[in-house]
């Protein structure tokens, strides 16, 4: 009886450890493939912000430039040879994406 309880605990702990979220998952926004990323204070990005009417002072996180969505990681045709990022605001038709964080798709 004690062996069965111990075995159940070991198996349960192993399964719990194996079900953590992968680091290639985007939990807070959309998965994007951007041609470049940078700070809002970068002169080229600041020019884009001026054209789009975005206040540079309001943006503190990484910015993605010329982005397209990545729909299914690992599916054919959905690779990202540039910078894969997870962005919280991609409402500028791919020109810029705000609140981005780099992720690793090679895991």
Swiss-Prot record:
Superkingdom of origin: Eukaryota
Cell compartment(s), UniProt: Secreted; Secreted, Cell wall
Disulfide-bond pairs as recorded: 26-86, 33-80, 34-67, 87-100
One term under GO cellular component: extracellular region
Induction: Expression is induced under conditions of inorganic phosphate (Pi) deficiency.
One Pfam family in the UniProt entry: Hydrophobin
Classification via InterPro entries: Hydrophobin
UniProt function note: Aerial growth, conidiation, and dispersal of filamentous fungi in the environment rely upon a capability of their secreting small amphipathic proteins called hydrophobins (HPBs) with low sequence identity. Class I can self-assemble into an outermost layer of rodlet bundles on aerial cell surfaces, conferring cellular hydrophobicity that supports fungal growth, development and dispersal; whereas Class II form highly ordered films at water-air interfaces through intermolecular interactions but contribute nothing to the rodlet structure.
Record text on subunit structure and interactions: Self-assembles to form functional amyloid fibrils called rodlets. Self-assembly into fibrillar rodlets occurs spontaneously at hydrophobic:hydrophilic interfaces and the rodlets further associate laterally to form amphipathic monolayers.
Protein name: Class I hydrophobin 3
Organism of this sequence: Pholiota nameko
């Amino acid at each position: 009886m004690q062996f069965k309880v111990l075995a159940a605990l070991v198996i349960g702990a192993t399964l719990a450890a194996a079900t953590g979220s992968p680091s290639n998952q985007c939990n807070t926004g959309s998965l994007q493939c951007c041609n470049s990323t940078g700070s809002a204070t970068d002169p080229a990005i600041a020019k884009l912000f001026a054209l789009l009417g975005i206040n540079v002072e309001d943006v503190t996180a990484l910015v993605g430039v010329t982005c397209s969505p990545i729909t299914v990681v690992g599916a054919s045709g959905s690779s990202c040879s540039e910078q894969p990022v997870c962005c919280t605001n991609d409402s500028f038709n791919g020109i810029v994406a705000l609140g981005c964080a780099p992720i690793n798709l090679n895991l």
